[in-house]
Amino acid sequence: MMRRQWGLWLNLALSLWLLTGCQQPAGQDTSARVELGPRPAYLVAQLPEGELKQQLQQCQGPLQPHDFSIGHRGAPLMFPEHTEASYRAAAQMGAGILECDVTFTRDRQLVCRHAQCDLHQTTDILLRPELAGRCSQPFQPADAASGRPASARCCTSDIDLDEYLSLCGKMDGVNPAATSVQQYVQGTPDWRTDLYAGSCPAVLSHQQSIALFQQLGRKMTPELKTAEVSMPFQGRFSQQQYAQQLVDEYKAAGVPPEQVFLQSFDWQDILYWLQAEPDYAKQAVWLDGRYEDPAFDPMQPGSWSPSMDELKAAGLNIIAPPLWVLVTSEEGAIRPSAYAKAAQQAGLNIISWTLERSGRLDDGGGWYYQSITDLTTDDSVALQLLHVLAQEVGVMGVFSDWPATTTLYANCMLP
């Protein structure tokens, strides 16, 4: 039986590869070529027998890039996040939209990094003595006697743009038990890989990301990251200037508003864009962080404020909560939450995050699956959840750390 299942999986993987990798006419723009690799077929093979599995197995190519499939920081399941290699991998897997999380350097230049102060865990800055000495908090080794973990804090605002661009990206992670810098930077989770982290993956400025995404023919979704330094920075760079500079760089590159999905967790940023940049703000995405409130309950509308109707009336068109907020476990099945239904009824479009960020799912799935832990027993739940989000919640897109999965679903199951 195991040999038969392996054979079926191998046949499906080969079929998907043939559909996606071998049907490009000579001379065709490679930015439109989609190559999924074996992971989507592996997930399909894990699905229980039924209509979803059958439809995905019978799906015919060629597959195309799709806006439903959003590359979360590129393709960081296997490539260092926010690097050129990661973005190119996401585009190759058919992500129609690519994300640059935006923060700023000491000379107030915008760069792609998930957090202003994560350089110690996503780049090789600590291995560069000339730059490591500029970190806000130098490396401190673990102390087993006191139980103190190893730590460091290196921020984009500690260095200038040219220094930032000299860094190499690495897989996100640190080793809290480290007693040396060399040990500390080796913290990649075992369900990811360092296989594609060699040869100094290039980090990018925001402007460079725009040029790359234009070259790849993809739409763009920058997230204005919350500053981890006091604003106004250096006494003269305000939050509104920061938000405006982000939009100005798209204007300068000639990127039309319909190609850009601005994002922020800060509602004040959304309001600023609605007033100052109404054309770009039509597709602004409010990343809903209200789940951090202990009283928040996606099944209880009274636990969140403003209401969905109030958000829509303020001019918001797209709301983006994490995966678990949009679903609930009901009679052994994944179903839309009250939050999802309220957003639908208010006329809000929905984007969600982040698929393929939880490692293996046979242990309940962790944070992103917390509302359906009892149903999360194997890796195929990623596709089952995606199916409910697309067909019952009606999301317009899903961020993924491995966009091949969302690309396959979008091509095979969406109009």
Name what the model sees in each region.
Residues M2-L10:
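Bacterial N-terminal signal peptides that target proteins for export
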Residues C22-P415:
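Phosphate-group recognition and catalysis centered on beta-loop-alpha active-site segments
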